[in-house]
A protein has these predicted regions:
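Conserved catalytic segments around the Walker B and adjacent sensor/switch elements
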Residues: 61-78
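Walker A/P-loop-proximal flanking segment of P-loop NTPase domains
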Residues: 1-46, 50-59, 124-126
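Defense-system signaling and execution modules centered on TIR/cGAS-STING-like, death/scaffold domains
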Residues: 1-17, 33, 110-113, 121, ...
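Mid-core helix/loop region of P-loop NTP-binding domains shared across ATPases and GTPases
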Residues: 88-170
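Winged-helix-like regulatory helical subdomains adjacent to P-loop NTPase cores
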Residues: 213-216, 220-327, 333
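Switch/connector loops and helix/strand junctions flanking conserved nucleotide-binding motifs
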Residues: 48, 77-80, 179-184
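The catalytic "switch" region of P-loop NTPases
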Residues: 8-10, 148-233, 238-241, 259, ...
Length: 337
């Protein structure tokens, strides 16, 4: 079966070239075994969802856990209506559970629940009746805002002491930002500025970019399947241009293999990679456009503008620096940002 380089949504091993997703998060398995709650945060399109879906499937296949990844993104439409948001969220959770888990691991029931407690009551009942320890990964957590976000975080914190018999054995929140940067408009603040509604997390993790060897191995998969080679200098140029950012690594290769060099008998050169770069810049795909939109935020401009001007960075909050790092708009180097 042919395969492609993926630039949209989670990778699927049967149709996409991909690296081992769980190899990027080896520290999570022992953390889960210790009944911990944690946060995974990284920019969009670096493989968070792919990695956590794969980990959930591996944990379930081991026979030791009931593990599933669910999303709360549908609740983003109701920032000041937690009750409506909870109902919408639980509806999508049910669909995800029925898709990813075998019937014998499904919840025995989906209780109606009390307003402001629907998430915690559902998780509590499922944990009590599950034949295995329950592990939940909650994706797109930072798509929520205001009262809905606070309500769900507090429900998770409230249930934490009852684990593992009365609440999930282990739980992870997945998003672009760490907890303190979740957006909460109430009280006049744009951010939570505290981890207190989820101060039960034991650690925060982030997913880094691909290494040069990762890029080389990913492109080699295409060579092994089709016979078309990436010249060594082409791989080096791709890594130089992308710094290993997973979406960019795949986007360059996708543009080259599907549009610029479709004849597999012709090797992929530096010129091919450079042409693909120019096409991506001109096209302004959604991922790049959304990052450009972040540059208009005041706390982003306060850091990016001095860097571009070659000036010393002013006294800015560490949280703002971490925010830019999480978004992938800057990185730590030998001489600082």
């Amino acid at each position: 079966m042919p395969k492609w380089f993926n630039t949209a949504g989670p990778c699927k091993a049967d149709i996409h070239y991909m690296l081992s997703p769980t190899a990027r998060i080896p520290a999570l398995v022992p953390l889960i075994a210790q009944q911990n709650y944690f946060v995974i945060h990284a920019p969009r399109q670096v493989g968070k969802t792919t990695a956590m879906l794969a980990l959930a499937q591996e944990l379930t296949a081991s026979g030791e856990y009931t593990a599933v990844m669910v999303s709360v993104e549908v609740g983003a439409a109701f920032p000041e209506q937690p009750d409506i948001a909870e109902g919408a969220i639980l509806g999508t959770w049910r669909s995800a559970i029925e898709h990813w888990l075998p019937a014998e691991l499904h919840p025995t029931e989906y209780p109606a629940g009390m307003e402001g407690q629907k998430i915690s009551q559902f998780l509590s009942l499922w944990a009590k009746t599950s034949p295995r320890p329950l592990v939940i990964f909650i994706d797109e957590i930072d798509s929520l805002q205001d009262q809905t976000l606070i309500s769900i975080l507090r429900q998770l914190r409230d249930g934490y002491p009852r684990r593992p018999q009365g609440f999930p054995y282990s739980l992870g929140l997945i998003g672009m930002r760490d907890v303190r940067d979740y957006k909460v408009a109430s009280g006049g603040s744009e951010r939570l500025n505290t981890a207190s509604p989820f101060n039960i997390k034991v650690r925060s993790f982030t997913l880094g970019n691909f290494s040069f060897e990762d890029v080389k191995n990913l492109y080699q998969q295409h060579t092994e399947l089709t016979g078309q080679t990436f010249l060594p200098e082409a791989v080096e140029q791709a890594f130089y241009l992308t710094d290993g950012q997973p979406w960019l690594v795949n986007a360059l290769a996708k543009e080259v293999t599907e549009y610029l060099a479709t004849d597999v008998n012709i090797p992929i050169t530096v010129d091919c990679i450079n042409q693909a770069k120019e096409i991506l810049i001109q096209r302004q795909d959604t991922h790049l456009d959304s990052l450009a939109e972040r540059l208009r935020e005041e706390r982003v401009k306060a850091i990016i503008q001095p860097i571009l001007a070659g000036q010393d960075l002013p006294d800015v909050p560490n949280d703002d620096i971490r925010y830019l790092l999480d978004l992938g708009l800057c990185k730590n180097g030998n001489q600082g940002l």
